[in-house]
């Protein structure tokens, strides 16, 4: 009996130690049910039938991999009816010492950490675009923070496509932290 308990106890301690040091990303201001607030949904001017405030959520993270020199954040709707998904937000070149993005970062970059850069999304412009799935179907919005081994992604501007940012992100990745928010209307 003791020989069976010891490996289990050691596994429990090593799992707990790993969990404390794992690279994690967290949604800091969700709704009561853990999803998006009305203010974080897409606004009416986009023409998709939603009437939210289009305000970006607050996010925080901890324990990035050793050697991290910057981060890239993406918010991706893998269920968008496009055959390709839909990129809702791309923020590149987040400095390595930053551990939080505040709520309400504007499309013009207001409230964005110094040095960080929002690039084009699938809405065609830089900045956060809130959730607005077609009625009756739940969508999964994947928030991914990638730790990078470079301080700045090469050849990236505010007009860069999500695919170009994704290419250079993958080429320079040290690790990822992610979570998913499900939303339906």
What kind of feature is each model-predicted range?
Residues 19-185:
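N-terminus-centered regions that define maturation/targeting leaders and the start
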Residues 7-16:
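Bacterial N-terminal signal peptides
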Residues 1-7:
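Bacterial N-terminal signal peptides that target proteins for export
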């Amino acid at each position: 009996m003791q020989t069976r308990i010891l490996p289990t106890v050691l596994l429990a301690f090593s799992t707990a130690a790993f969990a404390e040091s794992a690279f994690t990303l967290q949604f800091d201001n969700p709704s009561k049910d853990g999803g998006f607030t009305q203010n974080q949904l897409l606004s009416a001017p986009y023409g998709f039938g939603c009437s939210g405030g289009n305000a970006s959520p607050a996010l925080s993270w901890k324990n990035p991999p050793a050697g991290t020199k910057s981060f890239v954040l993406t918010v991706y709707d893998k269920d968008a009816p496009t055959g390709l998904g839909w990129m809702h937000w791309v923020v590149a070149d987040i400095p390595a010492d930053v551990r939080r993005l505040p709520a309400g970062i504007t499309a013009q970059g207001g409230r964005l950490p110094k040095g960080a850069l929002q690039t084009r999304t699938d809405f065609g412009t830089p900045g956060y675009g809130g959730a607005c799935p077609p009625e009756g179907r739940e969508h999964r919005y994947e928030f991914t923070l990638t730790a990078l081994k470079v301080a700045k992604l090469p050849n990236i501007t505010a007009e860069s496509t999500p695919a170009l940012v994704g290419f250079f992100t993958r080429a320079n990745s040290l690790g990822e932290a992610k979570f998913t928010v499900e939303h339906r209307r």
